[in-house]
Amino acid sequence: MTRQKGGVFAVRIEGDLKHALYMYIIVRDTESVRCCDPYALSSTADHEYSAVIDPGEIIGIEDVPLSPCSDPVIYEMNIRDLTVLSSWPGEYHGKYLSLCEEGQELDGMPCGADYLAMLGVSHVQVQPVGDFEGIDERYPEMTYNWGYNPLSFLVPEGSYSTDPQDPYARVTEFRKMVTALHRKGIRLTVDAVLNHVYDLQRSDLNMTVPYYYFRWNGDGTPSNGTFCGNDLDSERVMVRQLYLRTGDVLFVLYGVNGLRLDLMGILDTDTVNRIRDRALTYDRSALIYGEGWDMPTLLGQDRKASIANQAKMPGIGHFNDRFRDVIKGGTGDDRLGEKGWLSGGEYSNEEVIAVLEGSRHIFDDAGKSVNYLESHDNSTLWDKLCACSDEPKETLRKRQVLMIKAMLLSRGIPFLHAGMEYYASKGGRTNSYCAGDAVNGFDWRRCRTEYETVKQVQEAISLRKRLDMASLKVWTSEGLYLFDYGTVRVVLNPGEHSRRWGKSVIPAFGTVVLEEE
C-alpha cells in the first residue's frame, strides 16, 4: 500500500477478490504489527481475518416498506437469549435466523417474531450485534457474553450466524433477520457500543494509528470514563467519521431503523447530532436515543451528550432514570430495598405526575424521555420487587402489571425488556452479562404459563395506540390517579381505595381500566 494525499494508504488490485481474506502488516520503525481492517464489513471466525465481500449481496435481499412511526414502543432483547433455550420450538437456537422462522407456536401461543408482532411493539432493540470479544464463535455454546466488548463496529457478530467461518453467513443472515421483522411491521434498533473498545492496545484502531482514536489524560494514561479501560475520542475527525460510517452500514446495508447509543454521555453533542442527521437521511422515522449519563470522561461538561445537555440535541432520546426511580424505586445494588410510588413507597403527587406527564422538568420535549422500569442492566423488575417488599407474591404480581401499564400509558417512549411480561427472574443477579443461558434465556414455557399477563401488556400497548398521548394530563384525588387524554380517561389505582371515584369521572361512553385492589 502507498501513502496518498491526506495520509490515506491505498492499493488497487485487479481481479475479482470476492471471498478474499486479508489482514494488515504495519511496519513502524523497527516494529511490525498485524491487525484486521477496522473498516472491513466482515471477517472469519473470532476476528482472525478481514474479508472482502460484495455489499450488493446484502442490499439485494428483498425488504418491505414500513409506514412512518410517530409513537414508538421499544422491546429490548438479546438475539441469543430469545431463542436459545429448549422451550424455543423453532429450528435455529440463538441465531439471527431464528427470528425468520414464521408460524412457531407453543401450546397455541405464537413465538419468535410472531410473538413480538402479537405483542404490538413498534421497535425491537437488540443488544450489540457488532463483532465482540467474549464468545468463541466456533463453539458459542461454551461461553456467554452480552456483547459490550467491541472488536469491530462494522462486522456483525459471528456467534449468531449458522457458519461463523463464512464471512457471508453473518452479513446475509443479519440482513434477513431485519427483513423478517419488517415483514411483521416491526422496526429494529441496534445497541451501538461506540464509546470504547475491548482492549485498547490490541485493538485494530490503535494498531493502525497508535493513540489517535482515544482520549488521554495529562499523565499519559487513557481516559476511563466508560470504566472499561478506555474512551474513544468522538471529537477526532476520523473517530467521528467511523461513527457515521457505522450508521451508513447499519441503515443502508442492513436496513435498521434506529440506534441505542451505549454510554452516550461519553460522546459529544455535536457528534450525536451528526449521527442523528445522517440517520434521518435514510429513514425519516429513525430513532436515536441513548444513555445520557454524566460519565467522568476527558470532555467538557458543556459538550457531553448527557441529559444535562439534552436541549443541545433535538430529537435525541434519553433513558429517564428519574421515571424509573420514582415509579419502582432505586436500582443500584445498594438501593434494592428502596421503594417507588408503585412498589409501596412515599412520593409526592407532584413528583409522580411530573414523570407520568413526560418529565418536562427534565426535558424540553416529552418525546426525549425513554421511560423504563427494567433493562438488561441491574435487577429484573420482579427481583427488585421481591428485594424491597415482603408482600405476598400475588400482590407483587399485581404491582408489576400496574407498573408496566403506568409506563405504557405515560407520555414519552415506553421501553420494555424481554421477560418482564412474565415476571422473569435472574435469581437476584444484578449484572448477568456473562451468567449464561440458564439465567438470561427467554423461557417460552413460562411465557405461555403467564399468558394472561402477557395479554394485559398487549392490551395496554393496543390502548396506547388509540390515545392522544400529547394531550395527557394526570390528576389525583383520594389516592387514585386519572390519566386524561381528552376523549379517553384511564384510572390507575395503586392502593386499596374505593372504585366510586373512578366511576364518577368516566363518561358513559368511556372505558374504565382499573386494578381490583
Regions found by a protein language model. Name each.
Residues 73-75, 124-126, 188-190, 259, ...:
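Hydrophobic faces of well-ordered beta-strands that scaffold small-molecule active sites
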Residues 24, 77, 126, 153, ...:
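Conserved, mostly hydrophobic/aromatic
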Residues 3-101:
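The feature marks proteins involved in alpha-glucan
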Residues 366-506, 512:
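Loop/helix patches that line or flank the sugar-binding groove of alpha-linked glycan CAZymes
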Residues 79, 128, 190-192, 196, ...:
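A cross-domain feature marking catalytic cores of carbohydrate-active enzymes
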Residues 2-3, 141, 147-148, 257, ...:
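Active-site-proximal helices and loops of the catalytic beta/alpha 8
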